[in-house]
Amino acid sequence: MEKSTPYKIDQNLSYFYTLDEKNIFALELKHLLQDEDPFYVALLENDPTNNNTPEADGFYSTANVLGLDTGLDVYELNQNRRVKSNQLDAKLDYYYILNEKSNLNFVGGTILSKQNFDSRFFQVLDSQGTTLDPTPIFGADPLTSNDIEYKFTDLYLGLRYRVKSGIFTFSPGFTAHAFNTNNSQYGTDFFKDTFQKILPEFKMIMQFKRSESLTLDYRQQVNFTDVNQLAKGLVANGYNAFFAGNSDIMNASIHNVSLFYRSYNLYNASNVFARVAYTKTIDQISTDFNFVPGSVVSFRTNLNSPFDNETLTAFGRIGKTFKKIRTSIGGNFTYSKSFQFLQGNVNENLLYNHSYNTSVGTNFTKAPNVRLRYRVSFTDQISGNRDDFNTVTHVPSLNFDAYIWDSLTFKSDFSFNEVKQDGNVTNSFKIWDMTLAYRKNKDAKWEYELIGSNLLGTDSRTTVNAGNISRSINETFILPRFVSLRLRYQL
């Protein structure tokens, strides 16, 4: 019997000190100590008498690809894995107040991280514990064990200036980083990268009123990976799915810009929210998928994409109340461009998604309330080497709740879902839940509640998903019609 004894110790310290009205200090310390030791065991039946014949077991070709001993009645596959992490984050902010409308923020800090990753994939040959370290026939360097130490250091200093002029508040700034990463594998393979980078940032707020503003935000970021993506030896995610890291992986650079508008108006009971954001990722850490011919084995590794990934998102919502009637209308839009690496080939994937929703409902204090909602969503996925994938989803719903005779509460929730893929209905289902609760008065100790779930007896719901390398239809089974009585006593 394998035992797993992981632990995680996360400590945080925050300290604020005001020296005087012009000098303020803020200290933040975080420390993470973590030990993970997941294990993997798979038992697969085998008939060694029909090897190399048309009647061979389905796993036989896969066993050959993995380099296993095929002469046993059972394939017993094991993987031991251990990841130790030790990370310290420390940051000191110093604020110098210039005047009522401007201040300076000096920041300095460090991130010190160390990770150790050890793993071994092997086959158990007999009850005495004899093991075999297989030699797979796929991958550039098919090692079945890992022994890696990864260290990451980030030393940084930054300056931000904040000034207010009229309705504008400007906050330009930058942070200068000195990065150092190095990893050693098997005690012989060393990789080190040291570089410096200045990351600018800018924020502008237009405060039209106390309840209305427009915010523009831009910043650059650097994204690093962790030890799991660097370990070169094979790691089993399943008996036929393996991953090997890349010790030469570099960091990714990210540009983010966003524009956000908000408005509250208490006089005409309305609110407006809108946001547009754009993200561009350079040297994205991507996955290269490979399938071993003649088997069901998939093999993944990673690389820095030579192409830039882009994402554009936008959403908006308007809500207004007319006396006791609440209304809202909104929409979302997403565009993304990514690149898929499969069997050494590159394919561009484009995703367009836009959805719209509206609702109208009542807001009575004593009378029953009803709310009607409707949402429609359109998704288009365009892939260079596959047919386009188009999905339309319609979701109307009706909610009702009433508080009757100061003792009885009635709630009803109904929704209908219809999914169309390439113009054809792939799934439609209805869900209706209801609750009836009785409490004699607000001081009563007893409450009786009758709950009905899935009253229409819907069996399942189906979703159609389009991934980077495959398309899938997933069926989720729903609990059958269920009615229960709940008694609650308040002490």
Language model feature labels by segment:
Residues 1-490:
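Primarily recognizes Gram-negative and organellar outer-membrane beta-barrels
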